[in-house]
Amino acid sequence: MEKVVIVDAIRTPMGRSKGGAFRHVRAEDLSAHLMRSLLARNPALEASAIDDIYWGCVQQTLEQGFNIARNASLLAEIPHSVPAVTVNRLCGSSMQALHDAARMIMTGDAQVCMVGGVEHMGHVPMSHGVDFHPGMSRNVAKAAGMMGLTAEMLSRMHGISREMQDQFAARSHARAWAATQSGAFKNEILPTGGHDVDGVLKQYYYDEVIRPETTVEALSALRPAFDPVTGTVTAGTSSALSDGAAAMLVMSESRARELGLTPRARIRSMAVVGCDPSIMGYGPVPASKLALKKAGLTASEIDVFEMNEAFAAQILPCIKDLGLMEQIDEKINLNGGAIALGHPLGCSGARISTTLINLMERKDAQFGLATMCIGLGQGIATVFERV
């Protein structure tokens, strides 16, 4: 079976969804920008040699509809002979895109794939056009479709206090801002055109969503966002709304050698699981355990984790049940996470994987694990190994 390697991984800055940098930039353009740039950064690879493009996107309507993967590849002037498909596993879409491409390569059905994902939550809101089947409540709790309430459920089940959530959210902003200031994101962020508050076109080199002034005290003053009576989850401890895209160049290790390209990481294992929709945020626990089992590793052997921060109330139970509470500051989301950077749904899987690979390089780490919860009760995880 072919070994699958990542030879490049980049992302756009994360723009605020409400009146932010990408308010006049379409999702297809964010995607095409990354596709063109991956090819420009790796001139040894002919675009025509790409076997397939897998692109994650959740809200596949309006500008994100009608197979945005193909639309973006055509805008990027990738040869018409290269196919492209849009992948949807809700929050895990672009990580699923990576898994789909990896399996094609492992089985020998492909040698080179471009993967990634995008979500413009300013142009296409998460709830746009959604119409849940009225009979769904016979099988799952109605609140299972309300992500904030599933986070409230997890916090109560696992004893996650409001103070713990506020502290974790403040940490996310502080670490993301420190990473920005130190240049830790420089190697993963591709400068991208957007518009400032006056409408002037400029290049953005940094994430617009981070709030460096965030404090536990300020967060503690916010009202509950989903359960106004007994709730503890606020807007400040939830993932920010942002627009962005991320992309990776994936190929067989043998093809990378032939092209003279240096692999940055190898995919060691992959896993996806289902869980109770009412606690959808718990999905990273069984997904991570399954990925670790497939890799022949334990959580203690993983040097760095990237766990998507849908909510502080959601990620803390996952950290606790993976036995990592004492290692948060050494291993978990060292450059902050989605609470500070936002969670553009179809982008996030590729985004956290890109951030993880860069962190592994900076720390000279051997193993890293990226994992996410998924709406309606799923989890997805990938174990990476430095080559």
From Swiss-Prot:
Q: Which GO terms of type biological process are on file?
A: fatty acid beta-oxidation; phenylacetate catabolic process
Active site (record annotation)? 91 (acyl-thioester intermediate), 343 (proton acceptor), 373 (proton acceptor)
What HAMAP family is this protein classified in?
FadA
PANTHER family according to UniProt: 3-KETOACYL-COA THIOLASE FADA (PTHR43853:SF11), 3-KETOACYL-COA THIOLASE, PEROXISOMAL (PTHR43853)
Q: Where in the cell is it found?
A: Cytoplasm
Q: In which pathway does it act?
A: Lipid metabolism; fatty acid beta-oxidation
Tell me, what's a Pfam family for it? Thiolase_C
- Enzyme class comes to transferase
Recorded family membership = Belongs to the thiolase-like superfamily. Thiolase family.
> Catalyzes what?
an acyl-CoA + acetyl-CoA = a 3-oxoacyl-CoA + CoA
Enzyme Commission no: 2.3.1.16
Gene Ontology molecular-function annotations: acetyl-CoA C-acyltransferase activity
List the gene name. fadA
| Record protein name field | 3-ketoacyl-CoA thiolase
Which InterPro entries does UniProt cross-reference here?
FadA (IPR012805), Thiolase (IPR002155), Thiolase-like (IPR016039), Thiolase-like_sf_Thiolase (IPR050215), Thiolase_acyl_enz_int_AS (IPR020615), Thiolase_AS (IPR020610), Thiolase_C (IPR020617), Thiolase_CS (IPR020613)
Q: How does it assemble?
A: Heterotetramer of two alpha chains (FadB) and two beta chains (FadA).
For this UniProt record, the keywords arranged alphabetically read as follows: Acyltransferase, Cytoplasm, Fatty acid metabolism, Lipid degradation, Lipid metabolism, Transferase
What is the recorded function of this protein according to its Swiss-Prot or TrEMBL entry? Catalyzes the final step of fatty acid oxidation in which acetyl-CoA is released and the CoA ester of a fatty acid two carbons shorter is formed.
One GO cellular component assignment for this chain's record is: cytoplasm
